[in-house]
């Protein structure tokens, strides 16, 4: 087991980078004339449109780039979640004596001849409740606002149950039933927690790599058939679409720089960032390369965090990212609320006025939600 490569402040800074990309993307991509992303499916016309705006840049270029690339904050969250799981459950003893008795007999030898499901079920229940605690406050607030504002979503009973049970990702046509849209992440995370505990926990690295290769292989097969298909959409809504960054986080926690090469020189890290940015853009131009972009997104974010941490005059930016990471959970669940309030301003022509008000309000509401979520008791393992 590798010692902690990413410190707690570094993890928070990475969360800050990720949530900034996500909450800005989720505003920008709802604006009509702005370039759309290839998040669940690969659309060549979106890539062609990106190339057009890059060839003839205007004042909306930052909005175009946030719309197209901002969703890659999700793979960074998956990477960090996997990293945290390994550091928490594999790097040190974490079970109490009572919990260990569920897995071991009195003699201390591991029970054999039968599968003990109690501990995995406790693990899954614990992480489901953690996700539920984070989701429920934002979901209740959003649904009330959604009902009293124009364009409210029509929920079916099954949609609500699936949202609260976090199995909405597996239902047909997830685009039409998951509302607010970013909440698909909770079902994805629950699936990955289950996969980790049942298949990858304390297993040989070959299990992780094998599952990553299988998921990537199936995605490539779907892509060669029709990268715009509903089959591709449903596939990437579920754990298979997030297995690359999640598996990468597991391997990075265990093996460190053997998996993601970072450097101890800010200059070298800077050129590493330039290389990653160039590679991310070029890989995004075709379906095969698009499949592997999350790998380089994770590497880029780690390099950026390392660079900001090492350069003294950039320490202010690092502290801002670290603070943003500390409110990232609340910002994730609350930003659909502020988006629905402020996006009409941008849609009626003043893009940056609406965006600026959205940013200010979202951060303030996220801070308030953070204080509220602290009042909800944490689940017990």
Regions found by a protein language model. Give the residues of each.
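Structural signal for the C-terminal ends of transmembrane alpha-helices
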Residues: 83-93, 198-204, 223, 248-260, ...
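Short juxtamembrane and helix-loop transition motifs at transmembrane-helix boundaries
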Residues: 116-121, 141-151, 166-177, 224-232, ...
């Amino acid at each position: 087991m590798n010692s902690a490569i990413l410190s707690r402040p570094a993890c928070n800074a990475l969360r800050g980078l990720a949530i900034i990309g996500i909450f800005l993307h989720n505003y920008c991509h709802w604006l009509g004339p702005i370039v759309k992303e290839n998040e669940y499916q690969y659309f060549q016309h979106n890539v062609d449109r990106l190339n057009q705006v890059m060839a003839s840049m205007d004042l909306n270029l930052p909005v175009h780039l946030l719309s197209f690339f901002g969703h890659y904050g999700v793979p960074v969250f998956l990477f960090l979640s996997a990293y945290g799981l390994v550091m928490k459950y594999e790097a040190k003893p974490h079970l109490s004596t009572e919990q260990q008795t569920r897995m071991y007999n009195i003699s201390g030898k591991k029970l054999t001849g039968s599968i003990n499901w109690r501990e995995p079920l406790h693990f899954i229940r614990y992480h489901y409740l953690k996700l539920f605690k984070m989701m429920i406050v934002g979901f209740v607030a959003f649904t009330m606002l959604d009902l009293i504002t124009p364009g409210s979503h029509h929920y079916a009973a099954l949609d609500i149950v699936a949202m609260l049970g976090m199995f909405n990702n597996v239902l047909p046509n997830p685009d039409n039933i998951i509302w607010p849209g970013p909440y698909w992440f909770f079902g994805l995370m629950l699936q990955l927690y289950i996969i980790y505990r049942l298949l990858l926990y304390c297993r040989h690295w070959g299990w992780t790599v094998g599952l990553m290769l299988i998921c990537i292989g199936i995605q490539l097969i779907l892509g060669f058939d029709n990268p715009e298909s509903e089959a591709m959409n449903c596939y990437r809504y579920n754990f298979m679409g997030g297995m690359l960054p999640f598996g990468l986080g597991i391997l990075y926690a265990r093996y460190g720089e053997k998996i993601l090469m970072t450097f101890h020189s800010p200059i070298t890290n800077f050129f590493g960032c330039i290389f990653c940015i160039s590679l991310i853009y070029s890989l995004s131009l075709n379906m095969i390369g698009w499949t592997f972009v999350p790998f380089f997104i994770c590497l880029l974010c780690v390099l950026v965090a390392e660079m900001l941490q090492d350069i003294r005059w950039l320490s202010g930016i690092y502290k801002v990212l670290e603070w943003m990471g500390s409110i990232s959970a609340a910002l994730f669940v609350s930003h659909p609320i502020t988006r629905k309030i402020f996006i009409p301003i941008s849609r009626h022509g003043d893009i940056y006025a609406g965006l600026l008000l959205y940013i200010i309000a979202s951060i303030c509401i996220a801070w308030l939600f953070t204080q509220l979520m602290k009042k909800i008791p944490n689940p017990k393992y």
